[in-house]
Design a protein with these regions (language model features):
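Loop-helix junctions at membrane interfaces
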Residues: 1-159
Length: 159
């Protein structure tokens, strides 16, 4: 149901790319947007995917400057919330012109702006983003031990 498109783990690749480098994060985020476009998804979904470049770039630059962020549960959750908020805000900004331009289904207007856009898209994206971030960390922790990368960002809660 557009503009919502919550698919569990759909942001995992972007988060793992953020753990690697800013360039990797931007290319993965842009690539997913191109993928949605080529797959024929509605334009609102494509632009929402393109907005991922913002949180991916910001988050990966922060991780590059603060590589210890992922080493404690508390700091990683604060980071997850911050990137989730940026992610949600970007997606709400993308959806608003479609909503106010009367380009949504009647069900969205029946629910109203607060429920349809702010809660469903905004808050829903923050929660979805944080779940996917947790999944990405769970995958990244063993992978980062097995694979040598130019920039090391590790997840180590027991250090």
């Amino acid at each position: 149901m557009e503009p919502a498109s919550f698919t569990l783990a759909s942001h995992v690749a972007i988060f793992i790319a953020m753990f690697i480098s800013p360039a990797t994060a931007v290319f993965v985020a842009a690539g997913t947007a191109v993928g949605f476009l080529l797959a024929g998804f509605p334009i609102v979904i494509v632009i929402r995917a393109a907005s991922h470049v913002v949180f991916a770039a910001a988050g990966s630059v922060y991780l590059k400057k603060h590589p210890d962020t992922l080493k404690t549960f508390k700091s990683s959750q604060v980071f997850s919330l911050a990137t989730g908020l940026l992610h949600g805000i970007c997606e709400v900004i993308v959806v608003m012109p479609f909503y106010f331009g009367n380009n949504m289904s009647s069900a969205y207007y029946a629910k109203g702006f607060i429920v349809s856009v702010v809660l469903l898209v905004g808050v829903g994206t923050v929660v979805h983003s944080m779940i996917d971030f947790y999944l990405a960390q769970a995958i990244w922790k063993p992978v980062s031990k097995a694979v040598k990368l130019p920039e090391k960002v590790s997840v180590n809660y027991n250090a």
